[in-house]
Amino acid sequence: MKIGVISDTHSLDTRIPNAILESLKNMDMILHAGDLMELNILDSLKSICRDVKAVWGNMDPIEIRKQLPEKQVITVGEYRIGLTHGSGAPAFLIELVTDIFKSDNVDIIIFGHAHYPINEKRGNILYFNPGSLTDKAFSPFNSYGIIEINEQIKARIVKI
């Protein structure tokens, strides 16, 4: 299974660039780790992929928070993926998201918030932040992620 991972699409232009949609159209699933700002982002993603899941982020308005969960646990084959946004100081994000999923027995934790990519294995858990798709406030580049799950997990960051 090939999973496209995006986060932090909040910016002055709330549309996902066509080139990014094109690169994500062959995914089996797309996960958005929050800070959508507008639900039309999900409509764009659903136009290219049937299986789209998302959580709300700290910048999302109440209308989005009413429609999306704060966290999800998704099973793909024999692997469990935790999806959340995160909050607070970026230096402590991994600890925070670990605590959010401490009783969920996950193999991967996908999160956003920091705007810079993380692809790091600690113990038995892969921590994956795709970076921001549209905002370079805290990173020198925009990015998204691809996670491939077969017998193993392979994850990579794609710089835009």
Q: At which residue positions do the language-model features occur?
A:
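N-terminal active-site segment of His-dependent metallophosphoesterases
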Residues: 1-47, 51, 60-69, 78-80, ...
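Active-site-proximal segments of metal-dependent phosphoesterases and phosphodiesterases across multiple
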Residues: 60-105, 135-138
